[in-house]
A protein has these predicted regions:
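Charged boundary/loop elements
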Residues: 25-32, 88-178
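Non-catalytic, peripheral interaction segments enriched in hydrophobic/basic residues
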Residues: 1-107
Length: 178
């Protein structure tokens, strides 16, 4: 295929779901903004996108996502983790609800348990404290608010370089944005 738009659409349809497989469980360690590009799956996704665009490996990740119309996999992983939490919390299985409560209690002793990693990532969002309070009290997380916070956080990358003169700043992202 020599049509990048078709390849990118196929990637969004098939590659992104494959990259999400089981991410509700293993992906929580990559939900923090500072770790979103640490995952091998995300690295492969970016390499694929850069290959489709024909750019160098050194091209800024955010510019590649913007050019391709893709989100970082972290966005999808975050959404999947919130849906899993809400589903387990509201499950009609008493055992599953007990597991969620036990993991919530365990987070104070083990910083790498599922709930602790989710809370660490939630804290970074604009309404992070409200999200964390909801989890700690066993309430539902509002998926639409979490997604809006994530998108705003992703846009902040561009807000930081908005209006900067590319001749005065050496970052590639500044040159791409302006």
């Amino acid at each position: 295929l020599n049509r990048p738009d078709t390849v990118l659409w196929l990637a969004k349809t098939y590659v992104v779901p494959a990259g999400m497989y089981g991410s509700q469980i293993w992906g929580t360690q990559y939900l923090k903004q500072s770790r979103q590009f640490d995952s091998l799956v995300q690295t492969c996704h970016l390499s694929f996108l850069k290959g489709v665009l024909g750019t160098k490996r050194s091209a800024p990740n955010w510019a590649v996502f913007r050019e391709c119309g893709h989100e970082p996999l972290r966005f999808y992983w975050f959404r999947a983790a919130v849906k899993l939490y809400n589903g387990m919390r509201a499950s009609n299985s008493e055992l599953l609800r007990k597991v969620v409560r036990a993991d919530c209690a365990f987070m104070y002793r083990a910083h790498h348990c599922w709930t602790a990693e989710l809370l660490t990532a939630l804290q970074e969002l604009e309404h992070g404290q409200a999200h964390c309070d909801a989890v700690k009290s066993g309430e539902e997380l509002h998926l639409s608010l979490c997604c809006a916070d994530l998108r705003k956080q992703n846009r902040s990358v561009w807000d930081a370089v908005d209006g900067l003169n590319p001749r005065e700043h050496a970052e590639k992202l500044v040159s791409y944005h302006n």
